[in-house]
Every structure is written in C-alpha cells, then in structure tokens.
Amino acid sequence: MNKLTHFDDSGQAHMVNVGDKPATHRIAIATGKITMLLETFKMVETGNHKKGDVLGIARIAGIQASKRTADLIPLCHPLALTHVSLEFRLDSTTSTISCKVRAETTGPTGVEMEALTAVQVALLTIYDMCKAVDRGMVMGDIKLLEKSGGKSGEWKLA
C-alpha cells in the first residue's frame, strides 16, 4: 500500500509540496446518481419544475463547486482548471439521474477531487431543488471512474 501523503513523518497533517513536480495534462472522470420518486423524476425530465431547469442549475452548481474544491477540502491544492463538463443521464425505469463529470487541468497535481466535488454538489443541487416534493431521494454510487496524467499515469476503475 502507498504511504498517505497528507501526513508528515511525525504524523501531522500538511499540504503536499508539489512545487518540484512537472506540469502535465491531467483528466479525471467521476460519477454518481440520485434516485427519486417517479413523479419527481417526471417533473425534472419534462422541465415542469416550478423552480426552473433543475439539470441546468445543477450543471452550473457542479462547475462552480469544482472551482471551489480547495476551499472545501482542507489539504487540496487550488487548481487552474482548463475544462469541466457535466453530463446527465436519465433512466425512467429506475427514476434515477446519473451525473458524470470530466475535469481537466495542466499542472503538478491531479483533478480527482474537483471531479468528485462537482458530482456531489450537482446531485445535492438536484436534491435541494426537488426536496419540497420528495424528501426521500437517495444519492449514491459516487466514485472516480478514471484519471490520467502525472507520475502515476493512467488509472481506470475495474
């Protein structure tokens, strides 16, 4: 198992020094989903929600969240993101909305946390916009699907 990098030799938390690492193009793709009542799902799917375009607002929230990740995760480096996109897939058979995020940067550290944060905030935004009609929505299956770039190279979830 690899050593935990956010702790120094005496066990104290610290921000990893990435100053000597080369800048490389880095990509991370993450996903998650939210399941809801069929009536709630139909409201989102048809765009008939009184608060407006639920998925459009969730997309903007996810992008904003990716840019604020370092403010939320204490030892996460602030990054200059070069691209963030969110894709939603609607499955009416399970009343589930899946969110997939692709985040990119060119720099000395990866964008996994930015992609994961974007997924979670997008799903939370859907929950927030729909909670008046469905408090029983369930978010889950949030995970990193793949990452590339840097010293560790390519990684894909098996």
Curated annotation (Swiss-Prot):
Catalyzes the conversion of (8S)-3',8-cyclo-7,8-dihydroguanosine 5'-triphosphate to cyclic pyranopterin monophosphate (cPMP). Gene3D superfamilies: Molybdopterin cofactor biosynthesis C (MoaC) domain. One of its GO terms (biological process) is Mo-molybdopterin cofactor biosynthetic process. InterPro entries: MoaC, MoaC_bact/euk, MoaC_sf, MoCo_biosynth_MoaA/MoaC, Mopterin_CF_biosynth-C_dom. The keyword Lyase applies. One of its GO terms (molecular function) is cyclic pyranopterin monophosphate synthase activity. Its EC number is 4.6.1.17. Pathway: Cofactor biosynthesis; molybdopterin biosynthesis. SUPFAM superfamilies: Molybdenum cofactor biosynthesis protein C, MoaC. Coiled coil: none annotated. Belongs to the MoaC family. The keyword Repeat does not apply. Homohexamer; trimer of dimers. It catalyses: (8S)-3',8-cyclo-7,8-dihydroguanosine 5'-triphosphate = cyclic pyranopterin phosphate + diphosphate. This is Cyclic pyranopterin monophosphate synthase. Substrate binds at L75, C76, H77, M113, E114. The active site is at D128. Keywords: Lyase, Molybdenum cofactor biosynthesis.
